[in-house]
Amino acid sequence: MGTPGEGLGRCSHALIRGVPESLASGEGAGAGLPALDLAKAQREHGVLGGKLRQRLGLQLLELPPEESLPLGPLLGDTAVIQGDTALITRPWSPARRPEVDGVRKALQDLGLRIVEIGDENATLDGTDVLFTGREFFVGLSKWTNHRGAEIVADTFRDFAVSTVPVSGPSHLRGLCGMGGPRTVVAGSSDAAQKAVRAMAVLTDHPYASLTLPDDAAADCLFLRPGLPGVPPFLLHRGGGDLPNSQEALQKLSDVTLVPVSCSELEKAGAGLSSLCLVLSTRPHS
């Protein structure tokens, strides 16, 4: 038996999908959201891929952009991955459901065990699922329903799975994330704090908590690529995006902070953790 939570963030590969021109128009722009600068969004996406590959040392796989899938870059919504198992989700928006096809094929090619959702009554967006290393929390939100959460529990039977009500338009991971194996980070909004309080009641494990001024700053990724002698990384929104949260993030002293920007991609509804899928194809020690 290893240390509880030690499986959190283990990764060798990252999967991303290129930004299509259609992201700047139609559904990709999002109703009522500001106009999106396509070139800037593509630059942000390119920098993210570079950080994953060069800074974190991950093997990067990039699916090509597809104009018929304007929100295709938000592939974090298309799968829930733990160990060698990938649960292919059923996004709330019917227009987004074809996004899972290319992701499924890529994960199959990497040797993961694929689990499908066959229940047409289920909805599940991957960014409503938070894995702590010990257990899963699934946000019951506009995007994910109780049947979707039940399928997460059926798929990952080795872990406790609890449901957390999420109010407003957010996904659970848009409100809180893991700053380390024992630390939950959360935004300061009422919705974020309500979610964290619910998690504290539901869990049997003691987590430290860190409140950040910005909800979007809590949408981060704790990653352990397993590089010799290198501490874990925290991929997070940088000072150019969220300056008010940087001082609080410095309190996470056990990680190497790796800032990235996705302020333009955010206009299409992207949070940081929605822009990539990370997985490990190495045996877990």
From Swiss-Prot:
The keyword Hydrolase applies. GO terms for cellular component: extracellular exosome; mitochondrion. InterPro entries: DDAH-like. SUPFAM superfamilies: Pentein (SSF55909). Phosphorylated by TBK1. Phosphorylation inhibits the translocation into the mitochondrion upon Sendai viral infection. Changing S253D: Loss of mitochondrial translocation upon viral infection. Loss of inhibition of MAVS-mediated innate response activation. The active site is at H171, C276. Putative hydrolase with unknown substrate. Does not hydrolyze N(G),N(G)-dimethyl-L-arginine (ADMA) which acts as an inhibitor of NOS. In endothelial cells, induces expression of vascular endothelial growth factor (VEGF) via phosphorylation of the transcription factor SP1 by PKA in a process that is independent of NO and NO synthase. Similarly, enhances pancreatic insulin secretion through SP1-mediated transcriptional up-regulation of secretagogin/SCGN, an insulin vesicle docking protein. Belongs to the DDAH family. This is Putative hydrolase DDAH2. It comes from Homo sapiens (Human).
